C-alpha cells in the first residue's frame, strides 16, 4: 500500500494540489493503512479490493471516537479521492465509498476583522527594512485579493501585472484578480527596493523569498501574519483564513453579491460561498454598522 500512496500523492502533485493538501491526504491514508494493518499484516491491493461499505463505516466510527466531525469527513474525503484514483487507473472496479453520504456540518461564522483592524495589521511591518517591506507586500496582497496562503507563496514575480493592477493566481483555480492601488504601490516598492539581491539564485522566479533566499514557506508566512496580528493588538481567534474572510465580508458589506465573491475566489459552485450568506441579512448589517466605530458613520443600506 505504501507504493500506491506514493503514486497517489504524485498524481496530486501533477494535478496541482497545494502541498499542504497533498501532505494532509498522505497522512490520512497512512492512518487508514495503520488501521488496516492493526493485525500486523501488511495491507495489499487485494485487501483494498476486498473492502466493503461496512469496513469504511467501522473505520468512520473509530475516527469519530477521537476526532470532530469535520476531521472525520476530511479523512473520508481523502479515502474517496484515493479510491477514485485506484478506479481511474484500473486497479479496482468499485469503491467502498460509492454512495456514502458524509454527515453535514453547519459552518460556524468566521472571525470578523473590522476594517480598522485590517489596516493596523497591514501597517504593522516596518517597511523601512527590506523584510518589513516584503511582509507589508504579502499582507497587502492577502487582503487585496483574498487569496489563500498556499496561493501567495506560489506566486512568481511574473504573475504580477502591475500596469493593469492584476495578479494571476495559479493552481487548480487559476484566475486573474484585481489589485488595489495601495497594493500596487507597495508591490512596486518591494520589487525595486527589497526583492533584488535577496534571492539565493538570481534566476529564481519566486515573488517572496524567505531569509534563506528561496521561496518562503506557508508556515513562514503564517508565523509572520500571527506576529503582526499580535503587534496590531488583535486579540481575536486568528487563523490562516481570517484575512480571506475579511476580504469577502468587507466586499459584501460594500455591496458586492456572492457571485462576485465566487469569481474572485475561483469557486466553481455558488454554494461554496454559503458561508457568507448571512452578511447581507438586515440584523447582521445593522449590528455591524451600529457597533463598528468607523462603519457607524454609514447607513446599513449603503
Locate predicted features:
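Conserved catalytic core of the tyrosine transesterase superfamily
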Residues: 1-302
Amino acid at each position: 500500500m505504501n507504493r500506491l500512496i506514493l503514486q497517489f500523492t504524485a498524481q496530486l502533485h501533477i494535478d496541482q494540489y497545494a502541498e499542504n493538501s497533498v501532505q494532509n491526504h498522505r497522512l490520512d491514508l497512512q492512518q487508514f493503512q495503520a488501521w488496516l494493518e492493526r493485525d500486523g499484516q501488511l495491507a495489499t491491493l487485494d485487501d483494498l479490493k476486498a473492502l466493503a461499505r461496512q469496513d469504511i463505516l467501522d473505520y468512520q466510527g473509530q475516527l469519530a471516537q477521537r476526532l470532530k466531525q469535520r476531521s472525520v469527513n476530511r479523512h473520508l474525503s481523502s479515502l474517496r479521492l484515493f479510491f477514485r484514483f485506484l478506479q481511474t487507473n484500473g486497479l479496482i472496479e468499485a469503491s467502498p465509498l460509492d454512495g456514502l453520504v458524509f454527515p453535514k456540518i453547519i459552518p460556524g461564522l468566521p472571525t470578523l476583522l473590522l476594517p480598522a483592524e485590517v489596516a493596523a495589521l497591514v501597517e504593522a511591518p516596518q517597511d523601512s527594512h527590506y523584510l518589513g517591506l516584503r511582509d507589508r507586500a504579502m499582507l497587502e496582497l492577502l487582503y487585496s485579493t483574498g487569496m489563500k496562503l498556499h496561493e501567495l507563496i506560489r506566486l512568481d514575480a511574473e504573475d504580477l501585472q502591475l500596469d493593469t493592477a492584476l495578479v494571476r493566481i495559479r493552481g487548480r483555480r487559476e484566475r486573474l484578480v484585481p489589485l488595489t492601488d495601495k497594493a500596487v504601490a507597495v508591490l512596486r516598492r518591494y520589487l525595486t527596493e527589497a526583492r533584488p539581491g535577496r534571492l539565493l539564485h538570481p534566476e529564481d522566479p519566486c515573488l517572496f523569498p524567505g531569509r534563506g533566499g528561496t521561496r518562503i514557506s506557508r508556515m513562514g508566512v503564517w508565523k509572520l501574519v500571527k506576529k503582526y496580528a499580535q503587534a496590531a493588538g488583535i486579540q481575536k481567534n486568528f487563523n490562516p483564513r481570517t484575512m480571506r474572510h475579511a476580504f469577502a465580508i468587507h466586499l459584501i458589506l460594500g455591496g458586492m453579491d456572492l457571485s462576485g465573491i465566487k469569481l474572485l475566489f475561483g469557486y466553481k459552485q455558488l454554494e461554496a460561498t454559503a458561508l457568507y450568506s448571512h452578511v447581507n441579512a438586515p440584523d447582521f448589517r445593522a449590528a455591524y454598522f451600529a457597533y463598528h466605530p468607523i462603519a457607524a458613520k454609514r447607513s446599513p443600506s449603503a
